Regions:
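Class I SAM-dependent methyltransferase SAM-binding "motif I" and its flanking Rossmann-like core
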Residues: 94, 98-142
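Ligand-binding beta-strand-loop-alpha-helix segment within the catalytic cores
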Residues: 11-86, 203, 208-220
Length: 225
């Protein structure tokens, strides 16, 4: 997000015609809380660029609202906007994308998910000791993510290496939700060396990437953004 802000400040990138749909949001937490994803997006991106905040959406379900109806409403909002052009993802140490934890249906849509203990432990560093940490979240489903025209997943650090290996080279499995990206025809996986350390065919992936760029340049399909 810092790089996007810099490009905007340099007048090389505008968000004036952008609609944003966040992957997920905690339940039971105020959107103005420092731990909410709404606040995170405001502080790290939205407050610093020319995006219309009326066109920034997060999946929410407040007390008294019907979770199924809220999930369907979010899905409909995405469809009405013309779908998602670029889905930006991270990956959890257990292979989750969004808050689609292991055993999530590969056909899932936006809904409430209970967070695993591993996810709670990994995210506990973001909460103060006496601060409420939600155990539930509203998240886009795996099928929702796969509907995007392009997917960019970024991972850094050795603690993500096992999940990255399972995602890229393991079987398609609900136990590693990120493995569903094997089905996407326009998925880009961006890794540092630590996150890629358990991949057995790193040299091949590097060679194939370079060859792909070369071929696309020859056919005039390559764009350096």
């Amino acid at each position: 997000y810092k790089q996007l802000v810099v490009k905007h400040q340099q007048n090389t990138l505008s968000f004036d015609n952008t609609t944003s749909f966040n992957l997920d949001e905690y339940l039971g937490i105020d959107e103005n809380s420092s731990q909410s994803y709404r606040q995170f997006m405001n502080e790290n991106l939205f407050d610093h660029v020319d995006i219309n905040k009326n066109k920034t959406f997060l999946p929410t379900c407040n007390q008294g609202e019907n979770p199924r109806e809220q999930g369907l409403a979010y899905e409909n909002s995405i469809k009405e906007a013309g779908g998602i052009d670029l889905q930006i993802l991270g990956i959890g140490a257990n292979g989750h994308i969004g808050f689609n934890e292991p055993t999530s249906s590969l056909a899932s849509r936006t809904r409430i998910k209970t967070l695993t203990q591993q996810t709670l432990d990994d995210n506990s560093r973001l909460f103060k000791e006496d601060e409420f940490q939600p155990t539930l979240a509203m998240t886009m489903g795996i099928a929702t993510i796969l509907d995007a025209r392009y997917v960019l997943l970024m991972a850094t650090g050795e603690n993500k290496a096992k999940a990255v290996k399972d995602m890229v080279a393991g079987p398609l499995s609900a136990m590693c939700p990120a493995s569903s990206l094997q089905l996407h025809e326009n998925a880009i996986i961006l890794l540092d060396k630590a996150a890629a350390s358990e991949l057995e065919d790193q040299d091949y992936y590097t060679w194939a990437h370079d060859q792909n760029i070369k071929i696309n340049k020859e056919f005039g399909l390559y764009h350096n953004y």
